[in-house]
Amino acid sequence: MNIEIDTYTNLPCEIWMHIYSFMSGELELFFTNKQFFSLLNCLNIDIKIMDYVYSKGYTVIAKYIDSLKESENELTKKDIFKEVDINKHFIDNCKFGRLSMIKYMVNRGVDITINYNIASRLSVQYGSLEVFEYLDALGFYSETEYESYAYLAAKHGCTNIIHYLVKNYCVGISDYDDLIMRTAAQFGHLELVKYSIDNRANIASYNNYALRFSSQNGHIDVVKYLVSKGADLNAIDRTTLRNIKINGHTNIISYYDTIGISERNSNSSGFYLP
């Protein structure tokens, strides 16, 4: 026999609240459907629902609550449904790449440039290209900000962001003394270094910054690649070699030793080939 059971109506509100007590403060049970959502009327806890919804990126729930408020639903007149500052949640949603919630918040009038565009900087840092593209299309960025975005993307190895910036003429590969290539080398992002050099970045820019700092930071793959591309080994002077040792990168020291570079044949301004 096929018996249909309505789980929601067959259990009293008190039982559902007891079940909720085992859920460590998570509210997802109430977001299952409209019937369960109405159980929030029975909830007796000190929590702001909108804080929870925004922090989780639940755009559909946020829009549903908006519709209830517009219809003056009694449930949404409870203190737990009071509005909260969406600016701080905007920052977190940009960090986590939640585009639908970001669009929702923009439509709600969020301050896109809050804290010196920290939201967009986080989208770059975490490689959220869709979010960055959307925010960029809103037209709030200056040339100086594009420079900082290029640095952040290169620092964190976000090749997708770099491709976007270059393709859309926001920055050039050689801009700011080959900032993209230098930064990528410094932080060990080999593919981005290759991309930059393939697109005519100057390997010796800024006093051979790329080779010196990739060496001091222990990025052996980057070092070997730069050397293979003709990096000026005179940049590896005695001071640089000592810094490499201080940082504990014995593999770099060993590599340089195999190609004839060591403190024995170096001075403060460059090495002498044996």
From Swiss-Prot:
The keyword S-adenosyl-L-methionine does not apply. Pfam families: Ank_2 (PF12796). ANK repeats lie at residues 85-114, 145-175, 176-205, 206-235. PROSITE patterns: ANK_REP_REGION (PS50297), ANK_REPEAT (PS50088). Keywords: ANK repeat, Repeat. InterPro entries: Ankyrin_rpt, Ankyrin_rpt-contain_sf. This is Putative ankyrin repeat protein L589.
